[in-house]
């Protein structure tokens, strides 16, 4: 079975994660895909495949003869999707021989256009997979799962010698909780790769330092006709807080190694308001400055409007794995060589986000990230090509070959 055929099957399984439940996994939907994957792994000969109570799927492939004592290499992808644009089942749409131009996404009224996504012109002639425009596609990260499964099938059909291989599919990556209950010992790998990137040939070992900030505002609500010098409008103080952050430090205005504050939720009225942000920066020093900036604004506004008007809670999420991967750069060198074997330009880029691998690296499992061939994740314009997925599979297999050469 081809990788894209698996993807078409997986995206039809509803698996959004949720920040609201406080459970692990955050949604029971994810077990539906986990059980399907366990069954498929067993059919592919991964005899010990199982899913645990927290919805982590594990499996192991024995070494070929003579390679039993070699280091163990792992591959990881995540089963959950974002909850945005995911209120009903995905309907994947295949467009053979894509012409590189505007493409209407079903009857949604949305158009996938090179004006918005310039790389689309480079996909001309490929077989493009999208949703119908009413949901995400779910290639993030079901494409990674499909590619790992196809790699396993290919290993069964060819003679690539290899040491022990370890496979894992995780829940709740999209809410930053993928490694929360990851059993490093059970997984067993010395090194691993996540398949959770974008363009095929992408190799990533630098990610954001990340934190979440919740800012709450307590107002004083009195009748507006008699409120002079008395009312404190929590909603207006919230607006004031946001206006004091650097106006150009938003996701829309930044790229590459530039960090940002991202306001993703606003709720409020006169009595109470709340702003929720994510804070991101590749540079640890600048990351700390961003957190201090929010603390300083909180102090200023409390001095202006009264003690207790503004409260700030910052929660650390993950760190830049570069400091770990720098000690085992052979992982990057092998991935780079694997791309070159197929005349695919290796794209070494910083991750403007995080992956399970970032946290796993700090848990003792160095784990850079590889591209799956997908683009425009987390929204209705998400897309991937059959050819890009095929290349990602070949690169993964070549990494295995080079790792044990």
What are these regions (language model features)?
Residues 185, 194-227, 231-237:
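Phosphate/diphosphate-binding glycine-rich loops and adjacent basic-rich segments that engage nucleotide
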Residues 67-161, 169, 391:
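Active-site metal-coordination/substrate-binding segment of hydrolases
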Residues 120-135, 218-222, 342, 374-378:
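Glycine/charged-rich beta-loop-alpha catalytic/anionic-binding loops adjacent to active sites
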Residues 235-405:
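Metal-dependent amide/peptide-bond hydrolase catalytic core
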Residues 121-208, 248-264, 268, 272-282, ...:
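Acidic/histidine-rich catalytic neighborhood of metal-dependent amide-processing enzymes
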Residues 130-139, 176, 221-228, 379, ...:
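A short glycine/serine-rich beta->alpha loop
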Residues 2-28, 129-130, 318, 378-379:
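N-terminal capping segment at the start of a domain
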Residues 22-70, 74-76, 80:
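A non-catalytic alpha/beta surface segment that caps or lines the substrate-entry region
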């Amino acid at each position: 079975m081809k990788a894209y055929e698996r993807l078409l099957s997986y995206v039809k399984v509803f698996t959004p994660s949720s920040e609201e439940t406080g459970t692990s996994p955050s949604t029971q939907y994810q077990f539906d895909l986990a059980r399907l994957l366990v069954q498929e792994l067993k059919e592919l000969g991964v005899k010990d495949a199982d899913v645990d109570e927290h919805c982590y799927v594990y499996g192991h492939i024995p070494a070929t003869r003579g390679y039993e004592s070699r280091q163990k290499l792992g591959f990881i992808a995540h089963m959950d999707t974002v909850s945005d644009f995911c209120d009903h089942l995905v309907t994947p749409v295949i467009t053979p021989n894509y012409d590189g131009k505007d493409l209407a996404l079903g009857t949604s009224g949305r158009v996938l256009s090179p004006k918005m996504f310039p790389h689309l012109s480079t996909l001309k002639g490929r077989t493009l997979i999208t949703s119908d425009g009413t949901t995400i596609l779910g290639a993030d990260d079901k494409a990674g799962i499909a590619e790992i499964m196809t790699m396993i099938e290919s290993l069964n059909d060819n003679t690539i010698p290899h040491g022990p291989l370890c496979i894992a599919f995780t829940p709740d990556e999209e809410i930053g909780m993928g490694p929360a209950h990851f059993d490093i010992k059970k997984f067993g790998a010395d090194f691993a790769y996540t398949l959770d990137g974008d363009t095929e040939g992408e190799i990533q070992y630098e990610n954001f330092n990340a934190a979440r900030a919740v800012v709450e505002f307590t107002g004083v609500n009195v009748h507006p006709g008699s409120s002079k010098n008395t009312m404190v409008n929590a909603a207006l103080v919230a607006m004031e807080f946001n206006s004091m952050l650097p106006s150009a430090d938003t996701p829309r205005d930044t790229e590459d190694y530039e960090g940002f504050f991202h306001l993703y939720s606003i709720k409020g009225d006169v009595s109470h308001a709340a702003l929720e942000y994510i804070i991101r920066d590749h540079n640890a020093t600048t990351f700390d400055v961003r957190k201090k900036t929010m603390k300083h604004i909180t102090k200023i506004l409390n001095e202006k409007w009264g003690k207790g008007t503004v409260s700030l809670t910052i929660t650390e999420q993950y760190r830049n794995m570069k400091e770990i991967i720098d000690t085992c750069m052979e992982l990057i060198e092998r991935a780079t060589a694997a791309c070159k074997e197929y005349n695919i330009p290796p794209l070494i880029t910083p991750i403007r986000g995080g992956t399970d691998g970032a946290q796993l690296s700090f848990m003792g499992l160095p784990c850079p990230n590889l591209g799956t061939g997908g683009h425009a994740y987390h929204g209705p314009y998400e897309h991937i090509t059959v050819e890009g997925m095929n290349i990602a599979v070949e690169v993964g297999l070549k990494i295995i070959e080079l790792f044990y050469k």
